[in-house]
Amino acid sequence: MQNLRPRQKGFTLIELAIATAVLLFGVVAVMQLVPYAMKTNTANRYDTTSVVIAQRLLDELTAQPFNNLTVTDPICGVMSLGAGAAGIPTMSPTANYLTMFNGNATVDFTQAAVAGYNCNYTDPNSASGGVYQVRWGVVVTDSAAGKVVSKRFVVGVQRSAMQFRFPVNVETTVQR
């Protein structure tokens, strides 16, 4: 009678070591993505808050009558709505306060802030008490008779102390 040895079943130690190394490599690669995902999630949350602040302020600015020169806001205080000159579009507060970026009007945060056209907004929902700098510019177009025909509002919001993030800009035009 012939004594046959039963066939071996299962993994060898080398196969197990290779599988463990591949799995470990995959876990380490994925773990390196976690800090980046957390950073972009936080930045996106700040951008979303900036859009909400800008839209709230833009809604308030556009709801004002055309001839109003100021409006009082509970957060920003007295806000200027721009003043026009007969027959020509006038940019308020200054001609270089708004700049063109990729074909869109934006608030230039490299310029010094102008009183009446900026405020700081503290986020009440942020545990760290995030502060956002809010600025706006107004382009007023008057008729030859000196009557306001249209106002273009551009609102920019930027989180203070955030490096390498562009400010959020929203704009609208109100016409008679």
Regions found by a protein language model. Name each.
Residues 48-176:
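Low-complexity, Gly/Pro-rich coil/beta segments used as flexible assembly/activation regions
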Residues 22-44:
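C-terminal juxtamembrane segment of a hydrophobic transmembrane alpha-helix
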Residues 18, 22-25, 53:
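Conserved acetyl-CoA pyrophosphate-binding loop and the N-cap/start of the following alpha-helix
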Residues 9-21:
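N-terminal signal-anchor/signal peptide hydrophobic helix marking the start
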Residues 1-11:
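N-terminal leader/signal peptides at the extreme start of proteins
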